[in-house]
A protein has these predicted regions:
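Glycine-rich, proline-tolerant flexible connector loops at the mouths of alpha/beta enzymes
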Residues: 111-116, 123, 127, 187-204, ...
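Alpha-helix-loop-beta-strand connector modules within alpha/beta enzyme cores
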Residues: 133-137, 151-152, 157, 197-225, ...
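Conserved small/polar residues in nucleotide/adenosyl-binding loops
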Residues: 387-394
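N-terminal small/glycine-rich loop or linker at the start of catalytic domains
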Residues: 62-72, 139-163, 282-294, 359-360
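Hydrophobic faces of well-ordered beta-strands that scaffold small-molecule active sites
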Residues: 153-162, 185-189, 216-224, 241-245, ...
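Short, acidic/polar
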Residues: 167-177, 229-234, 304-310, 374-379
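Long, compositionally biased, glycine/small-hydrophobic-enriched stretches that function as flexible linkers
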Residues: 1-139
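Active-site mouth loops of central-metabolism enzymes
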Residues: 155-170, 293-302, 364-373
Length: 399
């Protein structure tokens, strides 16, 4: 495995695979904050050249967090179909990119089970924005809860009827307004102010009563912590179509969210037994580049690789929805509209390549160098790449 290259008479050397991956990443303020980004455009190109010549086997053997230390790494590596992996392991990342851009959906789907997160992230780093849109457009992933999402030519949305005090009347007023706009076919999902069993149960029942009365084909969900939702199920307090949890790409970062793989395995088993939905896909996850660094759990890896690891974590539970909340942390991780757009396209592509039903909450914080035009640009590019789900009323500002 070669870790150096020469460009314009200067030799660029890299410590290891993790260093190559970090420096080959497109410019992100989060990687700069972590002190792992390329110091110049030329160094970034050099890292991409080295990465293009690495094999998928090199990446499999060098996860950014060691297998022995991390439950997300173990979940990712243990899920690999070894027979499929053996067929593709000799491909270089550059050759893998060419395959993805030239192959059809059937051929790409056939090799998904042989991939790891590092492979998925690596090939995304070699792609232009147009490559990401073109490749993602070919990938089809469907999922069914009460309804089915991911079919060609469709776009699903989440209705988020948040309320400052979780007042039921205020929440339901927002639900009715959103439904009148045709929003909410992916899920009616509230971010609760009060994370208690009683409050979560009451809201779930309100949503389900409304859905039944008006025969609304969708799913109900309250985005409380997974342990709160588990208690609701254990006590049979309310119908729950979808179970939610935010995910991170490492065991350390997951700990900051109050979860680990073992807990999520338990939650999945409980939900499978007691869910009120009818289909085989009943988990809902949210992610976003930068979470691991903010939780001091990035292990010196770049935020794109860590995000790809979230998708391997999510895939373990056959989710109905996975949603990257692009730009939600702020300029410390995605500085401006250009970085936000790039991250949204990367995440969408990586999620679909991983094999999960990928959506995007197209948003930005008020102190980012971004505006509504940037959001609309990203939304248009995502729909051009046949993204199947967007968050909220499609576009929003996080204050």
């Amino acid at each position: 495995m070669k870790l150096k290259t020469t460009l314009f008479g200067q030799t660029y050397s890299f410590r290891d695979v993790k260093d190559v991956l970090a420096k080959a990443n497109e410019e992100k303020s989060g990687d700069m904050l972590a002190g792992i980004a390329a110091q110049s455009t030329v160094e970034r190109v050099a890292a991409k050249a080295v990465l293009a010549d690495m094999t998928l086997e090199d990446l499999r053997k060098n996860p950014v967090v060691p297998y022995e230390e991390d439950d997300v790494t173990r979940a990712d590596q243990d899920a690999v179909n070894e027979a499929v992996y053996d067929q593709i392991k000799s491909l270089t990342v550059g050759e893998f990119r060419e395959f993805l851009l030239s192959a059809n959906d059937f051929d790409i789907a056939a090799i998904r089970s042989g991939l790891t997160s590092e492979m998925v992230a690596a090939v995304a780093k070699l792609m232009t924005n147009m490559d990401l849109v073109y490749a993602a457009k070919k990938l089809h992933v469907e999922a069914t809860c009460n309804t089915t999402i991911g079919r060609p030519g469709t776009l699903s949305t989440r209705l988020q009827p948040n309320h400052a005090t979780d007042d039921p009347e205020g929440i339901m007023a927002s639900v009715m307004e959103g439904i009148s706009y045709g929003i909410g076919d992916a899920v009616i999902g509230l971010n609760p102010v009060v994370d208690t069993i009683g409050s979560v149960s009451d809201i779930l029942k309100e949503f389900k009563t409304f859905m039944n009365k008006w025969q609304i084909p969708t799913q109900n969900c309250v985005l409380a912590h997974v342990t709160t939702q588990m208690k609701v199920l254990e006590q049979n307090l309310a119908p729950m179509d979808l179970m939610f949890q935010s995910l991170a790409g490492s065991e350390v970062a997951s700990r900051a969210f109050g979860i680990n793989v073992a807990l999520m395995d338990e939650a999945y088993a409980l939900m499978k037994e007691r869910k009120s939905s009818t289909g085989p896909n009943f988990m809902y996850f949210e992610t976003g580049q930068g979470s691991e660094l903010s939780a001091d759990g990035n292990h010196g890896a770049d935020q794109l690789v860590m995000e790809a690891r979230c998708y391997a974590f999510a895939k373990r539970y056959h989710p109905f929805l996975v949603n990257t909340v692009v730009g939600f942390i702020g300029p410390e991780y995605l500085y401006d509209g250009r970085q936000m757009i790039r991250a949204g396209l990367e995440d969408h592509f990586m999620g679909k390549l991983t094999g999960i039903p990928m959506g995007c909450d197209v948003c930005y914080t008020n102190h980012m160098r971004a505006d509504q035009n940037d959001l609309e640009n990203l939304a248009m590019m995502l729909t051009r790449s046949e993204e199947r789900r967007v968050g909220k009323e499609c576009l929003r500002l996080c204050r």
